[in-house]
Regions:
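Generic structural signal for well-ordered alpha-helical scaffold segments
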Residues: 20, 74, 78, 104-105
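PLP-dependent class I/II
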Residues: 2, 6-10, 22-30, 36-52, ...
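A glycine-/small-polar-enriched, mobile loop at the entrance of the PLP active site in fold-type I
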Residues: 31-38, 51-70
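Conserved N-terminal alpha-helix of the aminotransferase class I/II PLP-enzyme fold
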Residues: 60-93
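A short, well-ordered alpha-helical element
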Residues: 11-19
């Protein structure tokens, strides 16, 4: 397989790297680009890794993941969503992106179709191209109010569709599917004999008070055709650990384990034991963190909407603010370049999340209130 030209540089990393170089050169830059939680990894995770290393748990482990962690994940989702998974239906991976990539690599064949609902996480098209370069990608855009056009999705999916790739809670838009939308996506997939749903739910815990995340795990009729991917980067700030997982039927999990065996061998053994500690402790940091995010998001929303160029809606989850820039008369890359050059604020162009969204940009508000106020002060001067 040649390295396909369809693999593109992620614009959030591009702008973040540019900002890092400018900071090294002594320039005062405020980066609201990368989605990284501004909290510390729980001490019990670090202690669990250290303990595992002292006990000699530093060697090869099962390519599917250590049994204790797989069993704990299965029990956790069963308790939350009322589903019925076992450890044999769980696959541990070095991050959510690899978890998705493993599934795509094991499912896709040349000329298969994948339908992506946009705005989408920026790595999806490249992940698909790497897994199977001859895949036909179809994009179904959300409506302007971020609701799903069920009729358009139904029209896009056919018997050639191998996967419908979805992300709710959504990065970059901070929106979530309704119960009806989740059920409708399942019904559409089940109309066709070989169509899977790959659901990225890594922001499932970062939901604001009064809002409800509807997981595909709750839809029991889709279980055999569902790949649910998740991880610990957002819920436990473990971005640098690279640790994620997927839930799928046993047959597919076995294929993914074989794929991992012949590529990565296994996900880091001591890190898996650190993650195991997550399921032995209460997740009592989540509620106050979400309250803090909502407070910061409300501040940012109220302030940035005073600017004539920017109009956004208050998100329901996560730490991204999705803002319309049509009033500026410019496209997303141009606006992001000018924000950086003129006032030293870094954002991510909307076009990287789907072609329809070139009149949007994304800000990450996973920074302190002081940093956000500094950013707003600068953005107020931007013209």
């Amino acid at each position: 397989m040649h390295f396909t030209s369809d693999v593109k540089e992620a614009l959030n990393h591009k702008y973040s790297d540019i900002a890092d170089e400018m900071i090294k050169d002594g320039k005062d830059i405020v980066s609201l680009c990368v989605g990284e939680p501004d909290m510390k990894v729980p001490t019990y995770v670090i202690d669990g890794i250290y303990k595992a290393m002292l006990e000699g748990k530093t060697h090869y482990s099962n390519s599917q993941g250590i049994k204790e962690l797989r069993d704990a994940i299965a029990q956790d989702v069963n308790n939350i969503y009322g589903c019925e998974y076992i450890g044999d239906e769980v696959m541990i991976a070095p991050g959510v992106k690899p978890a998705s990539y493993f599934a795509l690599s094991c499912l896709l064949e040349p000329k298969d179709e994948v339908v992506i609902i946009s705005p989408y996480y920026l790595s999806y098209p490249s992940n698909i191209a790497l897994a199977e370069p001859e895949t036909v990608i179809k994009v179904v855009d959300l409506n302007d109010d971020l609701s799903l056009n069920i009729e358009k999705l139904d029209e896009a999916v056919n018997d050639k569709t191998k996967c419908i790739l979805v992300n709710s809670p959504n990065n970059p838009a901070g929106s979530m599917f309704s119960k009806n939308e989740v059920e409708s996506i399942c019904k559409i997939a089940l109309k066709h004999p070989n169509t899977y749903i790959i659901s990225d739910e890594v922001y499932d815990r970062l939901v604001y008070k009064g809002e409800v995340h509807h997981s595909f795990l709750s839809e029991k009729n889709i279980k055999e055709r569902l790949v649910l991917v998740n991880g610990y980067s957002k819920s436990h700030a473990m971005t640098g650990f690279r640790l994620g997982y997927s839930l799928a039927n046993k047959k597919l999990v076995k294929k993914m384990a074989l794929f991992a065996q012949q590529t990565i061998t296994n996900t880091s053994t001591p890190l898996q034991y650190g993650a195991l500690e997550i399921y032995k402790h209460p997740w009592d940091h989540i509620e106050p963190y979400c309250e803090s995010l909502e407070e910061r998001m409300t501040y940012f929303h109220n302030e940035i909407n005073k600017h004539p160029y920017f109009k956004g809606r208050l998100p329901r989850c996560s730490f991204y603010y999705w803002v319309n820039i049509e009033a500026s008369g410019k496209k997303s890359v141009e606006i992001c370049d000018e924000l950086l050059d003129k006032v030293g604020v870094v954002a991510t162009p909307g076009v990287t999340f789907g072609e329809k969204w070139d009149n949007y940009i994304r800000f990450s508000i996973a920074s302190s209130m002081d940093v956000l106020k500094k950013a707003i002060d600068r953005i107020e001067k931007f013209r």
